[in-house]
């Protein structure tokens, strides 16, 4: 029997799994990136499923009518080359069809694929991270000011706070 393909909104309990896929692909998802995407656009983070089991993901965030963003586009390796990624990609583009400009976080080895869809390389983004010490230089430098900062989980940030 043929498996049923579907695309649906990501659930909260699927976020850790999709984050682990991103890390396996060599992406550097920030802490709570997916929750922040989900909080910014409640309709913009999807999983592709076979018989309701997630096999792929895409974040497609509509910030406003002028700008949207696509990232987290992943199909698990064992399900690639079956057209599932194309269907997920087309779903995302359809969602952003009335947006003036779409930004894209692209895997370097897929740049040619994205150019075939009309995307042009604009810039390279590097994400830096520090592994290790609890005694970070920034914390020492701003030790007296740290009490004025409040750190909150990404899914607790209101959509009004992140709208352009």
Indicate residue ranges for each PLM-predicted region:
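Short amphipathic alpha-helix that is part of the acyltransferase structural core
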Residues: 1-33, 125, 134-164
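Conserved active-site tyrosine of GNAT-family acetyltransferases
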Residues: 114-119
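Conserved beta-strand in the GNAT
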Residues: 47, 53-61, 68-74
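Conserved GNAT acetyl-CoA-binding A-motif
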Residues: 70, 95-108
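A conserved beta-turn-beta hairpin within the catalytic core of GNAT-like acetyltransferases
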Residues: 62-70, 80, 122
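Short loop/turn motifs at secondary-structure junctions and domain boundaries
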Residues: 36-42
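Conserved catalytic-core motifs of GNAT/GCN5-like acyltransferases
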Residues: 99-105, 120-134
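Conserved acetyl-CoA-binding loop-helix of GNAT-fold acetyltransferases
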Residues: 75, 81-94
């Amino acid at each position: 029997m043929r498996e049923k393909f579907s695309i649906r909104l990501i659930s909260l309990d699927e976020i850790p799994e999709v984050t682990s896929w991103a890390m396996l692909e060599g992406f550097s998802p920030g802490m709570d990136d997916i929750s922040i995407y989900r909080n910014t656009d409640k309709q913009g983070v999807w999983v592709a499923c076979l018989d309701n089991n997630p096999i792929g993901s895409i974040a497609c965030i509509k910030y406003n009518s002028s700008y949207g963003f696509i990232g987290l586009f992943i199909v698990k390796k064992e399900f690639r080359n079956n057209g599932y990624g194309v269907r997920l990609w087309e779903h995302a583009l359809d969602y952003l069809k009335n947006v003036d400009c779409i930004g894209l976080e692209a895997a370097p080895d897929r740049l040619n694929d994205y150019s075939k869809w009309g995307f042009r390389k604009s810039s390279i983004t590097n994400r830096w991270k520090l592994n290790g010490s609890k005694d970070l230089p920034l914390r020492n430098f701003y030790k007296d000011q740290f009490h004025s900062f409040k750190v909150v989980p990404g899914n607790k940030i209101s959509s009004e706070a992140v709208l352009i």
